[in-house]
Amino acid sequence: MSYYYETEEVNNNPELKSNFPWLADRIHEGRSSIFHALGYVGLKTENAFGWFLSTERKTISTAKNEVFSSDERKLPGVAYVVVGGMAGNIFARNRIAPARWLITSLSTAATFMFCFPKTSKNIGAFVEKRFPAIRKQRMLVLEQTQKNIQNAQKSMTSAVEGVQKHYENAVKKIKGD
């Protein structure tokens, strides 16, 4: 248990108790209940803080072991990422708020991916390993994007062939064949 649950020794003034016995008892009960309530709150706070610290340590340990690459130089990379984020903010300074936030975030993310390529790949692998739903969604988007690119290539090929046929027909008409 905690030291908050120790009994409290209160020396009541005998004169006060003889004049107002109910008041002295109420004061003693109030002090004891407040003392115990604060002890309970303190104990719960200690437990919550301990849980928070253990979760933080576990998260940092996982990040060090699985995400961060040890052979990338951190200080210059972080400086470049910060400058990239500020540059994105400068580029978007006269835009509306959502566009400003989006451009700044994209600029920061792109700079991070450029300055920390191994860590970026590790983050992607970590997210896909820990969150299979995100991996599934990413694969679905990738398949749809590839299908759209193939459809666009087919459309462009047929459009180019159509333009070439019209060009050849126009040349034949001009030559009089």
UniProtKB/Swiss-Prot annotation:
GO BP terms = cristae formation
Can you supply one Gene Ontology CC term for this chain's record? MICOS complex
Q: List the disulfide bonds.
A: none
Q: Where are the transmembrane segments?
A: none
For this entry, the protein name equals Uncharacterized protein C1442.05c
